[in-house]
Swiss-Prot record:
EC class name: transferase
E.C. no: 2.5.1.3
Designated name of the protein: Thiamine-phosphate synthase
HAMAP family found in the cross-reference section: TMP_synthase
Organism whose genome encodes this protein: Deinococcus geothermalis (strain DSM 11300 / CIP 105573 / AG-3a)
Positions annotated to bind 4-amino-2-methyl-5-(diphosphooxymethyl)pyrimidine: Q39, L40, R41, C42, K43, N76, S114, K143
Similarity section: Belongs to the thiamine-phosphate synthase family.
Function: Condenses 4-methyl-5-(beta-hydroxyethyl)thiazole monophosphate (THZ-P) and 2-methyl-4-amino-5-hydroxymethyl pyrimidine pyrophosphate (HMP-PP) to form thiamine monophosphate (TMP).
Cofactor(s) needed by this chain: Mg(2+)
Catalytic activity: 2-[(2R,5Z)-2-carboxy-4-methylthiazol-5(2H)-ylidene]ethyl phosphate + 4-amino-2-methyl-5-(diphosphooxymethyl)pyrimidine + 2 H(+) = thiamine phosphate + CO2 + diphosphate; 2-(2-carboxy-4-methylthiazol-5-yl)ethyl phosphate + 4-amino-2-methyl-5-(diphosphooxymethyl)pyrimidine + 2 H(+) = thiamine phosphate + CO2 + diphosphate; 4-methyl-5-(2-phosphooxyethyl)-thiazole + 4-amino-2-methyl-5-(diphosphooxymethyl)pyrimidine + H(+) = thiamine phosphate + diphosphate
Residues where Mg(2+) binds: D77, D96
Pathway(s) per entry: Cofactor biosynthesis; thiamine diphosphate biosynthesis; thiamine phosphate from 4-amino-2-methyl-5-diphosphomethylpyrimidine and 4-methyl-5-(2-phosphoethyl)-thiazole: step 1/1
Gene: thiE
Amino acid sequence: MSRSLGRLYLVATPRPDQPEAEFLARVEAALDGGVDTLQLRCKAGSPQYGEARPYIALARRVGALAQARDVPFFVNDRVDVALASGADGVHLGQDDLPAEWARRLAPGLQIGLSTHSPEQAARAQAEHPTYFAVGPVYATPTKPGRAAAGLAYVRHVAALCPAVPWYAIGGVDLSTVDDVVAAGATRVAVVRAVLDAPDPARAAADLLARLPDAWEARVCR
């Protein structure tokens, strides 16, 4: 099923020491607060979800939360987990399986792509993904060792007015989101700003309130 992309995209990553019930409760709260696109990202080598079967089991539980709210659900990197869990799509990084190969393996999956430079953004648009991500806007511990692409990269992509939806990602939170929107982003993706907040539902609602409305998110500014 193809679900409409939203404006506030949560990349949900369980901590190594986090009980699954707590993780699921925080994801559910974030969805209730307004997260309208969701990705599950389990890091390679995770002691809990490094193997396919536990990753698939968690993806099915997270996907059920998204499906109940008609929110599009993506799995990071793993085409096999996305297929086995019934996800809407898979998100692929620059070092992951090429989008063309993913389409051959799973023609029905939507595809999201990470980009970190104008050249990568141009290539991403040529591959016709469901969406692509632009960042990291700011340095973030989620991607250690990766230099920030900065607001200049957001402005560059916004000026292109891509036909493909795109999300600004990397260090986006309540202290930075206004600058990211001013640079031209109408959609943002977050990790810690929502999932690590004391109240994920409130954090999501507060971020969503700072984004352009759904109609503006469909047009260039």
